[in-house]
Amino acid sequence: MNSLVATPPVPPHFYENSRFSPSRMMSTPSSSYSSRKRKADDDNDHDGRMSASPTNSPAFTPRQLPHSYRNIKRSRPNVSGRPLSLPRLLETLDTDALRTVVRTMCERHPQLADEVVHTSPRPNVSSTLQVLRNYQAALQSSFPLGGNTESDYAYNRVRQPLTNLLDALSDFTPNFLPPNESQASTSLSYLDGATDIIHALPRWSTPQNNIERDSAYDEMCKAWILVIREAAKRGGGIQLQYGGWDQKLAKHNQTSGGKLQGAVNELGFSLGWMNGPDTPSHGANSEMGSIRDQLFSGTYGLGTPVKVGPW
């Protein structure tokens, strides 16, 4: 009878709790906290060893920044646009632009013209002749391609560059003449180069078109005569004779077709060696010239016998 009585069922959670091990059941929160703390301490020790290892390495040398450097903060410039200063602006200008600026300033302020003239360096022979050659190059480049270069059509095409060259030649020449130029060698050097430029002027088939070229020769001949006369007053014309100017001027006269004959005659008269019917003292002048040559060459008196003994 009693065996037929059913045993009351046991709840399922009692069976689950019975599976846990005693050690699991006996673990307390304090033991879990201590294990976590020990693990954190081990991690901190490992990090400390890792951070300290480079310092103890012999290859690492700590560098200390200066105290003043650490306190200085790099200033950030305030970037903004501004115009160039006058010296930097002048560096960017080429010759033509700078010349235009100076000319414009002198036109606006006439009182600056004298200041510019006195401040500017005096032009030399080489720079002046180069300016004239530039005008000459512009003239040559203005000729039409093909056709007759001596025709009226070619003359009309190059008339303006030709006028520019002749005007420049007329303006520059007085600057190298006495009394503005006191050195005869400088004047003669300029006239030598300027005469070569006139030789290179084109010849035209129409005689009327050659009037400008002939006028340039006439002005150049007068300039030669003026310089020769002034040079003859200094040292008896020694610089004219021993500079080879007699030969240079004779060659210029030949190239010009005799248009510089007046200058050749003036040079011959100044040196005293001109051969012509209108020089009555030709023999005396030749003798004086011969003595002068011997004096400068150091051969004077070499052929004269020297007396020995009482005079």
Curated annotation (Swiss-Prot):
Keyword Transferase in annotation: no
Keywords, alphabetical: Cytoplasm, Nucleus, Protein transport, Transport
Disulphide-bridged cysteine pairs: none
Domain of life from the UniProt record: Eukaryota
Compartment(s): Cytoplasm; Nucleus
Classification via Gene3D superfamilies: Tethering factor for nuclear proteasome Cut8/Sts1 (1.20.58.1590)
Main location: cytoplasm
Compositionally biased spans, kind Low complexity: 18-34
MF annotations from Gene Ontology: proteasome binding
GO biological process, alphabetically ordered: nuclear protein quality control by the ubiquitin-proteasome system; proteasome localization; protein transport
Record carries keyword RNA-binding: no
Disordered as annotated region, ranges: 1-83
Function noted in UniProt: Involved in ubiquitin-mediated protein degradation. Regulatory factor in the ubiquitin/proteasome pathway that controls the turnover of proteasome substrates. Targets proteasomes to the nucleus and facilitates the degradation of nuclear proteins.
Assembly and interaction partners: Binds the proteasome.
Protein name: Tethering factor for nuclear proteasome sts1
Origin species: Penicillium rubens (strain ATCC 28089 / DSM 1075 / NRRL 1951 / Wisconsin 54-1255) (Penicillium chrysogenum)
Lineage: Eukaryota, Fungi, Dikarya, Ascomycota, Pezizomycotina
